[in-house]
Curated annotation (Swiss-Prot):
Belongs to the TRAFAC class translation factor GTPase superfamily. Classic translation factor GTPase family. LepA subfamily. It comes from the Bacteria. It is found in: Cell inner membrane. It comes from Rickettsia canadensis (strain McKiel). Keywords: Cell inner membrane, Cell membrane, GTP-binding, Hydrolase, Membrane, Nucleotide-binding, Protein biosynthesis. This is Elongation factor 4. The gene is lepA. Required for accurate and efficient protein synthesis under certain stress conditions. May act as a fidelity factor of the translation reaction, by catalyzing a one-codon backward translocation of tRNAs on improperly translocated ribosomes. Back-translocation proceeds from a post-translocation (POST) complex to a pre-translocation (PRE) complex, thus giving elongation factor G a second chance to translocate the tRNAs correctly. Binds to ribosomes in a GTP-dependent manner.
Length: 600
């Protein structure tokens, strides 16, 4: 099959919970991809976490055969993309593999921030966009109001928006006809030389790495020798095929088609999303535009609660890395926590997913240190560094300036919660860039330091807006800031795992809050425990946990006073020795407390 006018490559753009995966399920069911008895909810979401959280993490594709009302049979390639900001680059590459998009909006909720970000990416990729209003069978549905929102905010004509209910199957045939009639076919291939876009990849224990591709020019055949243009790696293609969503093996993928291939590739890290694949013997002259390496932006430490589990943690991280090359890790040691790993993530959701998979799939109990970001350090001697571990920050006297990453955030929030959201953004050192109204909701654009976002911003935003605010962000610039390293000392010894980098204006407040929290969490011992917060050599906050007093005179019922003095002196010498050699046991809850100072 190589008649491109009967191919439609499309994706579904939607905010979380607006019905993207449910609509995909209905389309698969309607086109006979699965029999009714084989259907399960969210067919394309393969991980348990994806189904439970209602999110899509890995891009998935499905090839459907649809006999349209014009009598022709069409091949519909549905690309189910991640919707969350952490996976924004994967979304942009998945959209680059398609010519059109269905914009699904919940008719009871309206346009959300995440919808905006992804629809703008689709417009950048010159997509034809078909608006679809979902959940029209609910009493709270307001289709006319939401149509107006789509026109006002996004600027596309929504007068002919499709009214559907993915859950009950209303209007699914209208969606399929719109895909055929309104979305364009792939452009005719201008060249016989293979040029393909690498959309996604994952690890299969039997086949090695499976690569999802969109063929732009030429054809991809079994036994062909191919070259990855970003890494110059060469492989021999072993299997070629497509998903319906079951795996089907074919001999060839032609221009305009989306499918998969395997080539005995050992690790996902060798397959860069957005890379161009070409023929080794007759390579194409230019790679496809838009490729960039996926770099982590949030870092934190993972330490096993039991040091004997270190090797198991190492193996578990290696297995996760097979399937997710955007997650990075390296070994590090801490005087307080022992040996663990410093891990890099695309964002906070990505961090949570990896943490949850380690707990669920590998049954690991971990201590997680406070998240941090990459800081650029410019030294007085002209040297420049990039650090993501607060313990690595050099002496402040040697530093000329420190730059931190700032983000551009779009927040859409109902009017009644606007004041609380503006206060939160101001507290987080935000700078307002834009403020506009959409019916009874406000759209605000802020510039915020990423350091302030990674702790508790999202939770507090949801809390102060009762869950109604939606939040979308993208990396903006690095800018100089008055940053300092806030260290924590317990009985004069620095606890590196509790050190954080904070803005100078917030250092004292944060230090006091952390000392108070630690005072409540560290158990009372037989000696005084002094908890201090410091900036360099200056102590800015202190709390003392008074010693548990052991009454050594309880058995002295009178008698010579010198006997009592001797016992008290012996106790004093013992306590001095404990202070000198005794290690204070800091419980796991104390490290978790470092993440939650903002809740005070």
């Amino acid at each position: 099959m190589n008649n491109q006018k009967y191919i439609r490559n499309f994706s579904i753009i939607a905010h979380i919970d607006h019905g993207k995966s449910t609509l995909a399920d209905r389309l698969i069911e309607h086109c006979g991809g699965f029999q009714a008895r084989e259907m399960s909810k969210q067919v394309l979401d393969s991980m348990d976490i994806e189904k439970e959280r209602g999110i899509t993490i890995k891009a998935q594709t499905v090839k459907l055969l649809y006999k349209a009302k014009d009598g022709n049979t069409y091949y519909l390639n549905l690309m189910d993309t991640p919707g969350h900001v952490d996976f924004a680059y994967e979304v942009s590459r998945s959209l680059a593999a398609c010519e059109g998009s269905l914009l699904v909006v919940d008719s009871t909720q309206g346009v959300e921030a995440q919808t905006l970000a992804n629809v703008y990416k689709a417009i950048e990729n010159n997509h034809e966009i078909v608006p679809v209003l979902n959940k029209i069978d609910l009493p709270a549905s307001e289709p006319e109001h939401v149509k107006q929102q789509i026109e006002d905010i996004i600027g596309i004509d929504a007068s002919e928006a499709l009214l559907i209910s993915a859950k009950s199957g209303i209007g699914i045939d209208l969606v399929l006809e719109a895909i055929v009639n309104k979305l364009p076919p792939p452009k005719e291939s201008s060249d016989d030389i293979l040029k393909a876009l690498l959309v996604d990849s994952w690890y299969d224990p039997y086949l090695g790495v499976v690569i999802l591709v969109r063929i732009i020019d030429g054809a991809l055949r079994k036994n062909m020798r191919i070259k990855m243009m970003a890494t110059n790696s060469v492989y021999k293609v072993e299997h070629v095929g497509y998903f319906t969503p079951k795996k089907h093996i074919a001999d060839v993928l032609y221009a305009g088609e989306i499918g998969f291939f395997t080539a005995s590739i050992k690790q996902v890290a060798d397959c860069k999303v957005g890379d161009t694949i070409t023929d080794e013997k007759k390579p194409c002259e230019q790679a496809l535009p838009g490729f960039k390496p996926n770099l982590p932006v949030v870092f934190c430490g993972f330490y096993p609660t039991d040091s004997s589990e270190f090797e198991y943690l190492k193996d578990s991280l290696a297995k996760l890395h097979l399937n997710d090359s955007s997650f990075e890790y390296e070994m590090e040691s801490s005087s307080a926590l022992g040996v663990g790993f410093r891990c890099g993530f695309l964002g906070l959701l990505h961090l949570e997913i990896i943490q949850e998979r380690l707990s669920r799939e590998f049954d690991l109990d971990l201590i997680t240190t406070a998240p941090s970001v990459i800081y650029k350090i410019y030294m007085r001697d002209g040297e420049s560094l990039e650090i993501y571990n607060p313990a690595d920050l050099p002496n402040l006297q040697k530093i000329e300036s420190i730059e931190e990453p700032w983000i551009k955030a779009i927040i859409i929030v109902p009017d009644e919660f606007l004041g609380a959201v503006l206060s939160l953004c101001t507290e987080k050192r935000g700078v307002q860039l834009d403020h506009s109204y959409i019916a009874n909701r406000a759209r605000i654009v802020y510039k915020l330091p990423l350091n302030e976002i990674v702790y508790d911003f999202y939770d507090r935003l949801k809390s102060c807006s009762k869950g109604y605010a939606s939040f979308e962000w993208q990396m903006d610039v690095y800018a100089p800031s008055e940053l300092v390293k806030l260290g924590i000392l317990v009985n004069g010894k620095a606890v590196d795992a509790l050190s954080t980098i904070v803005h100078r204006s917030r250092a004292e407040q944060t230090g006091r809050a952390l000392c108070v929290r630690l005072k409540d969490l560290i158990p009372i011992q037989q000696i005084d425990i002094v908890i201090q917060a410091s900036i360099g050599s200056r102590i800015i906050a202190r709390e003392t946990i008074k010693a548990l007093r052991k009454d050594v005179l309880s058995k002295c019922y009178g008698g010579d006073i010198t006997r009592k003095r001797k016992l008290l002196e012996k106790q004093k010498i013992g306590k001095k020795r404990m202070r000198q050699y005794g290690n204070i046991e800091i419980p796991q809850s104390a490290f978790i407390a470092a993440l939650k100072i903002g809740d005070e």
